[in-house]
């Protein structure tokens, strides 16, 4: 079985938008809440969401907090926040990973305003120091490209964050 169902509310691709999925759903908080509620009623595992902090010209704390509260009230208790807004027109998905500016502070404020939620932060995280800092304000960190580019980074995280010193060094593996 699966540990959870995760709804992706962050993908900005045209193909995904065309079918009203991904980041375009941030424009429809009531619909997202209804979907999450129905998913919660249909399964026994947690329903989580990954979303952006905004879209196009919408990057205000009040909007994001309203969106988070709607999905929280629908039964979602874990939210992964990509600390960039999604530009839905004019940028490719790859450009959406770099061009919109990171706003970690907004993620921290969402956690502060919703302490009962498990909030994970995502976006541009590439060092142990960044992870350590984010964990002061959030419940967890999601890392993508840094691990794709350097899979051994997982062992550095294991050693430095989880204090598991039984991890073999790169030299020992070779």
Q: Where would I find each of the regions flagged by the language model?
A:
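Flavin-dependent oxidoreductase catalytic cores
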Residues: 1-174
């Amino acid at each position: 079985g699966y540990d959870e169902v995760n709804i992706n509310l962050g993908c900005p691709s045209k193909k995904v938008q065309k079918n009203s999925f991904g980041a375009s759903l941030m424009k429809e908080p009531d619909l997202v809440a209804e979907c999450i509620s129905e998913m919660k009623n249909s399964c026994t595992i947690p329903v989580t969401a990954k979303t952006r902090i905004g879209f196009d010209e919408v990057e205000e704390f009040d909007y994001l907090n309203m969106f988070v509260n709607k999905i929280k009230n629908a039964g979602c208790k874990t939210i992964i926040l990509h600390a960039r807004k999604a530009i839905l027109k004019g940028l490719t998905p790859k450009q959406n990973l770099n061009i919109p500016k990171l706003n970690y502070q907004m993620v921290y404020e969402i956690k502060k305003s919703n302490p009962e939620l498990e909030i994970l932060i995502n976006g541009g995280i590439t060092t142990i120091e960044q992870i350590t800092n984010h964990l002061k304000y959030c419940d967890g960190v999601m890392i993508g490209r840094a691990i794709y580019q350097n899979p051994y980074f997982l062992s550095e995280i294991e050693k430095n964050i989880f204090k598991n010193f039984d991890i073999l060094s790169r030299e020992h593996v070779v």
